[in-house]
Amino acid sequence: YRAQVDEQWLACGPEIVIRGEALRAIPIEELIWSKLYVLQRERCDWTDVFKLIDAQSASIDWDHLLERLADDAPLLAGALEVYSWLAPDRAGQIEQGVWERLQLPYPALSPNPELSRARADLLDSRPWFRTQE
């Protein structure tokens, strides 16, 4: 396995309280890092990666994620390419430096706001990038 569980998984995550107990949740960067490697015929976790990026792109420590990926950064580049196709309006919210570091073009804003919805619906009719109606 490329994404090994280590101290950073438990030391750096946000603190949450469950039933009065303070616990640390897994940091989003570690979760994305591990899910990028799940590309099997019967299971692919990239949809989870897209949803995490969509919900938390502003709070992701992209430098840390890229450091964890190291030579496997092309996996993130591939996921971001697909994400920018699925949600071109939202992909532009990811800081430009991330795109530059991965040598990807910065996504152009879509002239059609319904484009993200239509493209996501091609892959799955569940409401990926929108609230349920």
Regions found by a protein language model. Give the residues of each.
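The feature captures the alpha-helical scaffold/lid subdomain characteristic of nucleotidyltransferase
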Residues: 15-24, 28-133
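Conserved catalytic core of two-metal-ion nucleotidyltransferases
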Residues: 1-7
